[in-house]
From Swiss-Prot:
Phosphothreonine carried by residues: T48
Pfam families named among the record's database cross-references: PsaD (PF02531)
Name listed for the protein in its UniProt record: Photosystem I reaction center subunit II-1, chloroplastic
Bias type Low complexity, positions: 50-64
Additional notes on this entry: After Mass spectrometry, it is not clear if Ala-45 or Glu-46 is the N-terminus of the mature protein.
Ranges for region Ferredoxin and ferredoxin-oxidoreductase binding: 141-149
Biological process per Gene Ontology, one example term: photosynthesis
Family according to the record: Belongs to the PsaD family.
Post-translational modification: Phosphorylated by a threonine specific thylakoid kinase in a light activated and redox-dependent manner.
Gene3D superfamilies the UniProt entry points to: Photosystem I PsaD, reaction center subunit II
Record keywords: Chloroplast, Membrane, Phosphoprotein, Photosynthesis, Photosystem I, Plastid, Thylakoid, Transit peptide
Amino acid sequence: MATQAAGIFNSAITTAATSGVKKLHFFSTTHRPKSLSFTKTAIRAEKTDSSAAAAAAPATKEAPVGFTPPQLDPNTPSPIFAGSTGGLLRKAQVEEFYVITWNSPKEQIFEMPTGGAAIMREGPNLLKLARKEQCLALGTRLRSKYKITYQFYRVFPNGEVQYLHPKDGVYPEKANPGREGVGLNMRSIGKNVSPIEVKFTGKQSYDL
């Protein structure tokens, strides 16, 4: 991913209605050294042709059959917050930033992961944050205190949107039929081979 020159970045988000991956044309550059500012985001929806949809289709293979990743609507309003979320940092211009969305049954106050309090709107909310961990922290708070489900996405500078969490539609601590275990061995730890038998082989006892 090419690093963009330092300058003013005027963001204009464009979404493509694909099955798993959308394109957002997010950054355009104007050369002005040692100056950095963000203008109000202008958002417009854009249709994609069938060939673009076919090219994006393989990106959804990770999700189990029957689950369709939710589409990010950039027109979703943000919570009411008078402070700062810490900005998107310089990383957002050359790497990525993160967007978390949720639906609230009413207007209520919540704690921001970056500090301070904000008012979530009744209905859909969208919040841009610089780090994935901030989305996870806020999402945990939403689920534990407010009983609200959430989703978050990664947005790249070239406009691509990647759906991140929950990956298959079910939060990780819940059982989900069809979910494949990672590093799963159907045996107890006591049935692993003796570590001395695999010493100097480059393998671990749980690998056998």
